[in-house]
């Protein structure tokens, strides 16, 4: 038996079905138990929700393997799952991260920004005023310390994010935007804000994007 904790059970089943066509599953898909993490964990983040992941690990304590799957990112990094991982450590279970692309590091590597000192700050505020204040704070930190600041945004807010960036940041600040990473349609652009203001096109409203700024 295999148990998988997921962000969305429906898409997880579809993914496993597709994978099984070339890599047979250890157990038939019909026999696999897929449990969704609670919605409030998605919204608040595992570290703030007070969610106890131990009940999801009962089968692991009995010797069964458990997989943690998220929608479009790396589980427990900008996606739900850290509470389950933490609970596994607390219970003495072995945690094994699997090799795979992580958009944050791919975007950083392709940005031309400082890859020795960087910080991922999650999502920025949705309110325009609060977002502008946060952007200026991150820009100041980047220029003072040389630390690259990275964040992500929901695709349908990409246009608002780019508009806010161009309104809030100094012309000499470098802004990198990477969208659709690992896809044939991937776009990675890294220019000063002044160059972006000349009419460079940002990501569309349907594609996940990673944003990064630095000196």
Where are these regions (language model features)?
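Class I S-adenosyl-L-methionine
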Residues: 4-96
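Alpha-helix N-cap/helix-start capping motif
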Residues: 9-10, 82, 101-102, 155-159
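Short, hinge-like loop/turn segments at secondary-structure boundaries
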Residues: 22-24, 111-116, 137, 168, ...
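A contiguous loop/helix-start segment that scaffolds small-molecule binding in enzyme catalytic cores
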Residues: 33, 64-65, 143-215
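A short acidic, often aromatic-flanked loop/helix-cap motif at beta-alpha or helix-coil junctions
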Residues: 40-47, 126-129, 183-186
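Short, surface-exposed amphipathic charged segments that create phosphate/polyanion-binding patches used
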Residues: 44-57, 134-139, 187-197
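General beta-strand structural signal in soluble alpha/beta enzymes
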Residues: 70, 95-100, 151, 177
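Class I SAM-dependent methyltransferase SAM-binding "motif I" and its flanking Rossmann-like core
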Residues: 74, 78-141
């Amino acid at each position: 038996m295999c148990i998988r904790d997921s962000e969305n059970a429906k898409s997880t089943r579809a993914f496993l079905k597709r994978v099984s066509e070339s890599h047979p599953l250890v157990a038939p898909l019909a026999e696999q138990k897929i449990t969704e993490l609670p919605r409030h964990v998605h919204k608040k983040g595992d570290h703030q929700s007070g969610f106890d992941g131990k009940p999801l690990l009962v089968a692991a304590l009995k010797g069964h393997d458990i997989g943690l799957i998220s929608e479009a990112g790396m589980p427990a990094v900008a996606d739900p799952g850290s509470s389950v991982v933490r609970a596994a450590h607390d219970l003495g279970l072995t945690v094994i991260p699997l090799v795979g692309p992580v958009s944050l590091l791919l975007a950083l590597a392709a940005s031309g920004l400082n890859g020795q000192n960087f910080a991922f700050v999650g999502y920025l505020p949705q309110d325009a005023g609060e977002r502008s204040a946060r952007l200026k704070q991150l820009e100041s930190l980047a220029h003072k310390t040389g630390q690259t600041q990275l964040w992500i945004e929901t695709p349908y807010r990409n246009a608002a994010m780019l508009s806010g960036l161009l309104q809030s940041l100094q012309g000499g600040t470098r802004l990198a935007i990477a969208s659709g990473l690992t896809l044939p349609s991937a776009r990675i652009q890294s220019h000063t804000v002044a160059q972006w203001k000349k009419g460079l096109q940002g990501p569309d409203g349907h594609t996940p994007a990673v944003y990064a700024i630095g000196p």
